[in-house]
């Protein structure tokens, strides 16, 4: 399915679905979860670099990424899923700014 591509292309229904199934569960999981995922994606999916940036143990990063998968159904280490999660974060933040 091309959900993130459709959402990024401006499909309002796709944006709503992506935000609801990926971004909102991340918000509900807490700031640490969202910060960990964002840092992980920014660091090229490196557990070690993410742990260093967040001043936590790599096992903490692993645990939080498992929680991301449990909450969203997307696996951050998978390239396609990571892209989908990144799109959801961007679109969710934009939607929050618009109110």
Regions found by a protein language model. Give the residues of each.
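Cytosolic nucleotide-utilizing catalytic cores of signal-transduction proteins
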Residues: 1-99
């Amino acid at each position: 399915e091309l959900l993130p591509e459709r959402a990024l292309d401006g499909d309002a229904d796709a944006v709503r679905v992506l935000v609801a199934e990926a971004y909102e569960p991340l918000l509900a999981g807490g700031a640490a979860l969202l910060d960990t995922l964002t840092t992980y994606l920014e660091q090229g999916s490196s557990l070690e670099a993410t742990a260093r940036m967040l001043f936590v143990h790599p096992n903490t990063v692993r645990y939080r990424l498992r929680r991301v998968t449990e909450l969203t159904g997307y696996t951050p280490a998978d390239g396609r899923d990571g892209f989908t999660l990144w799109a959801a974060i961007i679109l969710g933040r934009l939607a929050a700014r618009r109110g």
